[in-house]
Amino acid sequence: MSTQWGWALEPDQPGYDDARLGLNRAAESRPAYVVEAADEQEVAAAVRLAAEQKRPVGVMATGHGPSVSADDAVLVNTRRMEGVSVDAARATAWIEAGARWRKVLEHTAPHGLAPLNGSSPNVGAVGYLVGGGAGLLGRRFGYAADHVRRLRLVTADGRLRDVTAGTDPDLFWAVRGGKDNFGLVVGMEVDLFPVTRLYGGGLYFAGEATAEVLHAYAEWVRHVPEEMASSVLLVHNPDLPDVPEPLRGRFITHLRIAYSGEPADGEHLVRPLRELGPILLDTVRDMPYAEVGTIHHEPTSMPYVAYDRNVLLSDLTDDAVDIIVALAGPDAGAPFVTELRHFGGAYARPPKVPNCVGGRDAAFSLFTGAVPEAEGLRRRDDLLDRLRPWSTGGTNLNFAGVEDISPASVEAAYTPADFARLRAVKAQYDPDNMFRVNFNIPPAESWT
């Protein structure tokens, strides 16, 4: 129904299902209302509606990162709020809540500037940013959240606030890394960088080369500069027409490269990797930065159900590689995908304006995505348990899933001191925990 709250869709109305369902449907739910907000005023009205009816509030743009069910909640879908504007002179962009990275790239590329986007151009930019944001320029420039200049959000009292380090230092600190626990962000101003091209793409190795490739990769990353970002995906591709023929229906080891220095230097750095086992497909090349989404070549719009887990690793030793190959390699028949991303570099450095993003001590992120089937989940958990000796004990919530919603799992994403501070900020701005349809940070029991 069209109301003072915008299009507040109820379960029996046309468009309700389309508005409530995201890309990853692991936490499918039936909200009391879905508000497809067209602007920030409708977001604020939706929060006031939730307050009036004493309902929790959730937010979704693309639905890549579900956490908990939004049953009986007010779910704000921001996909209509996709505005992007660029101030080339200041090297900044203003990004509305529902804009995807693809649209941001379309606006920044003509100015010779690049955002600190993620690997998929179809992910919502703001959701990525409030989770920290580990992208393909991160080893060079740091987490995307480190480069947020200002933001505008709706807090639990229904107020629209312009937030900077000067106006609300605690709130500004908490939102950059604290997800949507403190309010609904309707827009952000972020830094842009003078990166116009990348030497990047994928080396797709046959499954039988997995052990050789991973051992070589673990040594190779110890010597690369911060301009080099890389990751490795272990996956058994489906036998489908949209999968390139050399990769179709077989296990592959997909090594991704994104080098933001000179192409000749990138080619030199990648050469040892090209000398490894059978390469089925090589897409590494000099490319415009706007084509960065082709490097990981991730799925675009087909809905799926995946239980995602993430652990941060301090090292990738030979023993750790052997465990990954044994439990997730070509002979394991693992019913899940496994991805390693190289961290370090600027990720490890504190930002000029502090935020709560954790995991800065990690050398790698290990991500798994599994279908919700008991045996597959057990085998995935066995892999994660066997890697415990190399775990930092932390996690990255942008790579976490519906099984990581416990207080202990959320707390593991932050340092103990930062988590205590986050709970104090939560108690100040959302004492009733209205914003809890997420990886929840509960308010401190008392706050003064």
Swiss-Prot record:
SUPFAM superfamilies hit by this protein: FAD-binding/transporter-associated domain-like
InterPro entries: BBE, FAD-bd_PCMH, FAD-bd_PCMH-like_sf, FAD-bd_PCMH_sub1, FAD-bd_PCMH_sub2, FAD-linked_Oxidoreductase, Oxid_FAD_bind_N, Oxy_OxRdtase_FAD_BS
Cofactor needs: FAD
UniProt family annotation: Belongs to the oxygen-dependent FAD-linked oxidoreductase family.
Keyword Metal-binding on entry: no
GO molecular function: FAD binding; oxidoreductase activity
Entry-linked PANTHER family: BINDING OXIDOREDUCTASE, PUTATIVE (AFU_ORTHOLOGUE AFUA_1G17690)-RELATED, FAD-BINDING PCMH-TYPE DOMAIN-CONTAINING PROTEIN
Modified residues (Pros-8alpha-FAD histidine): 64
Function: Involved in mitomycin resistance; oxidizes reduced form of mitomycins.
Endpoints of the signal sequence: none
Designated name of the protein: Mitomycin radical oxidase
Alphabetically ordered keywords of this record: Antibiotic resistance, FAD, Flavoprotein, Oxidoreductase
Induction: By mitomycin C in concentrations as low as 300 nM.
A GO BP entry: response to antibiotic
Keyword Methyltransferase belongs to the record: no
